[in-house]
């Protein structure tokens, strides 16, 4: 399999996973979020929580957990997307912008999809949060790519200097 095909399959698979999570009804989605909060707090506190404590922790953490999930999910999508686009062209500003646009369009389609799922809603603020996550993922990939390129350049310079020193001896 070529690199392009593997990266394309990763992007499509990640988008499918986002779609599956978005297709959960409001009740199922709430149970998953609440379960993550309760299990995490019981693990951290090293004890079982009372029902009152569970409700308290859920009320404190449900928004950060759910919005954090958006950021992480779209961070990964952005990272995968720019990695895929790199296979089709040289990296320049247009490639980064195109990756961001594709992630935003997918986020919008995801929120429209959620609008039609029972107990869910499509939220503009979630598109904004998804966009932040995508931009962070794309930036992270770009930063790593730039560091790899700099390392390659430094290695070439070192090799040239070694040759010059060797030739001068």
Regions from the PLM with identified roles:
Residues 1-75:
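"…centered on the first transmembrane helix and the immediately adjacent amphipathic helix/loop
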Residues 149-169:
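Membrane-interfacial, low-structure loops and terminal tails that flank and connect transmembrane helices
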């Amino acid at each position: 399999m070529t690199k392009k095909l593997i990266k394309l399959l990763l992007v499509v698979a990640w988008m499918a996973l986002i779609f599956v999570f978005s297709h959960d009804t409001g009740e199922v989605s709430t149970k998953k979020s609440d379960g993550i909060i309760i299990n995490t707090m019981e693990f951290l506190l090293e004890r079982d929580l009372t029902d009152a404590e569970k409700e308290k922790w859920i009320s404190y953490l449900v928004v950060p957990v759910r919005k954090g999930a958006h950021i992480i999910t779209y961070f990964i999508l952005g990272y995968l997307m720019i990695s895929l686009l790199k296979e089709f062209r040289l990296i320049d500003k247009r490639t980064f912008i195109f990756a961001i646009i594709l992630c935003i369009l997918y986020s919008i389609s995801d929120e429209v999809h959620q609008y039609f799922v029972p107990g869910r809603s499509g939220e503009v603020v979630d598109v904004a949060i998804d966009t932040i996550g995508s931009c962070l993922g794309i930036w992270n990939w770009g930063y790593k790519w730039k560091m790899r390129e700099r390392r390659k350049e430094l290695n070439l310079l070192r090799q040239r200097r070694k040759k010059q020193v060797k030739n001068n001896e």
